[in-house]
Amino acid sequence: LIYMYLLNRHPLRGGKVWDIDPAKDEELSMGEKALFIEHPTDKTNRVKPQDLDKSQLPQGDPTKLPYTICGPYLKKLFDRAFIDGLHNPSARPSADEWEDALVKTCDLVQPCQNPKCEAHWYVFDNTTKPRCPFCGTEYKGQLPILNFYYAPSHGKYMSENYRLMVYDKQTLYKWHSNRLVSANEKTTDEDKKPVGDFHFFNNQWILI
């Protein structure tokens, strides 16, 4: 469902017809013969853009908007769900892993500088010159990124594999500064309160 909501297409409905009987084809494509439409090596079930309605484009065409635009955290889980675990349920991500990846992905979202862009936002692509995948606009200007670390012992720091994109009026929450606090359905109202925000003022970044 996460793949479908974010990309507006089904991860298994590609161009491959497994049987001339529609009912049998549906059964095979969703079961025994199920194959991820963006599988990196098996292209059997690739989407055929020429068969799509105009209303399904560009979202329906993975060559235009590949699942990698969802960022590294979700990309990793999509691989486990639709490649490693498609026919091996034990290899699929847990609900907690999906929740954690969604939170981390939200913190990688940055605004598109094109006022006419229909998407308005996109996930940082981890390059020095990020470009909006929806309208093609390259980001101009400073783009600070916070990398989070924790100290398992005095003087020792380890990466949390967690980053926060900084943009004007970006908000800092307690779970960004305290790894014992998580952003989920159990987060208390007190922990949901912002603890700071970033502003670009007089050509400088400040944290209030």
Regions found by a protein language model. Name each.
Residues 74-109:
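Terminal C-lobe "cap" of eukaryotic-type protein kinase domains
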Residues 2-75:
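Conserved C-lobe activation region of Hanks-type protein kinase-like domains
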Residues 116-126, 139-142:
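Cys/His-rich microdomains that often coordinate metals
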Residues 134-146:
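Short Cys/His-rich micro-motifs in 6-15 aa windows
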